[in-house]
Amino acid sequence: MKKRTLLLTLAALLAATTISANDSLPFTAAVKENGLWGAVNGAGQVVIPISYDRLGLSLSEADEQKEDLLSEEGRDDLIEAEKDGLRGFFTRTGKEVVPISYESRSIWKEGALAVRGKDKKISFYKKDGSLISGAAYDQVSDFENGMAIVKRGATYGYLALDGREVKPVYQEVRFFEDGLAAVKEKGRWGVIDMTGRYVVSPIYKDTGAAFQEGRLAVKNQKNLWGYIDREGKEIIPPAYKAVSQTFSEGYAAIQDDSKRWGFIDTEGHVTAKPQFKAVLTPFSDGLSGVKTIDGNGYARPDGTIAFMADYDQLFPFKDGLAEVREGEVETRAVRSRPPISIGIGWGWGDWLAFRHHHHHPWGWGIGMPIWYPGWYDYEPVPSVTVKRGYIDKNGKVIASPANDRVFSAGEKGILLSKDGRYGWVNREGTYIAHTIYTGLLTDEEDGVLLAKDENKKWGLLSMEDGHELLPFSYKEIRSLGSGLFGYKEEDKWGIADKDGTRLTAPLYLAVSKAGEGLLPVKTKNGWSFLTPAGHEAFPHDDTFSDVTPFSSGLAGVKVKGKWGLIDKTGTYVMRTAYEDLDIL
């Protein structure tokens, strides 16, 4: 969480992710004194006692923190603290939300958090600090649509956000969707509402994951599949060997006795007779990935092929592009979890359940429906080494999987590499930067590419048309935010803007990320701050040996080994007194 002015490595820049700050949140900084952590507000007053071993927005493992902090709106108003191996949560103003009591937890979801205490039982807290229920459970899911799946002993039930419980009496359960959920009792599946009342009697051998577009897939005692509506009426009577779990864009996939697949609409009308070897994706942008006798492609609802796309894996379209993959199976050791099944995580043909209940590492999703903290093992499992590519809705290749690597598509384009060189294409498939660069960093916010040539020199390119903004004559270029860039010439740094205008000569020993329009720079006399025009923001008498970027009008400064806080005029709002400081 620290935002120090230490120089970032190229690897760190490539891997960096940013959690957006909420300007409406109260300013809070973690401070360290005598080896213990607490927190202060924008006036320098202690709001969380300085008595904890660790303190931060998230104390999860580093590779889990991004998902933790992005789990829901308002998550960054909460601060986690740890003492003697147990953790809890406070608000930024210091109100206790969850007492220091748990060993492990879920992420916050729908304003609720699952925690496991020393007794190994799991309970839920709300953001207002109240327990959702006094009951404890052996396993739980995240909340989804106001209900969490809970397990006590060998049976499952539900817990509502208001503390109401649907008693754990079921063999298996699904998540609620639109107020209804499928449950299994005495070997048969039915549908209950949020009070636990059956709205569809348990008469089915199996069901789909959830209601979608008003329909739920059901399997009768003759092993035939169809769909029911919310009242339990068999709108599409069970007559198919298999069906897709859910409808998408008004269509579902069905398989007949010939083991061929076709499409139906929500009223059961066959729009494409069974003809495909498999249906690979749900409908998106009017197209569904299918496997034909001639290979893979994308089909329209009437079964006509829009275009062939003969890749190993097809995915749904998103924002006009579909990911495609080619790869081969290998075996490697990966971290895995125990397979606890309550029925989610299956599909028909090659169309797996696309209704994704995130997340890693807590909660459940496809193949891991119950949150069970702390149980991991390492074992060899089959995996797929794949090469990603992208195509558009006409089948045009935007980024070919023939490249050595194609990175995830961004809002403006796609980074790729081939033969040890990097390039970048826009979302229309036009090469803005050909694969000739030994290093390439993307800055979509400012619309530029930071590129490194064969001579190990860095330059700046426009993301719009690839024209050169800064010449390839620098040892390094770094994106500093707020439309500013640091360029390194010899052993000194200068500042340029996103149009390539040099705002300062190379005068500085180091530069750091800008915060609220002010840029930290280091000279032989220590750190100071520059305005966007490259002028000193304010004079200061003390020598700052380290600083943080500004946030909510304040920045941390280190003087003679101690940290304090200043405002944008350079005035101290908290004198230097602490061993360490992190703006949260």
Segment roles from a protein language model:
Residues 22-584:
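Residue-level detector of conserved, function-critical positions
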Residues 1-7:
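Bacterial N-terminal signal peptides that target proteins for export
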Residues 9-17:
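Bacterial N-terminal signal peptides
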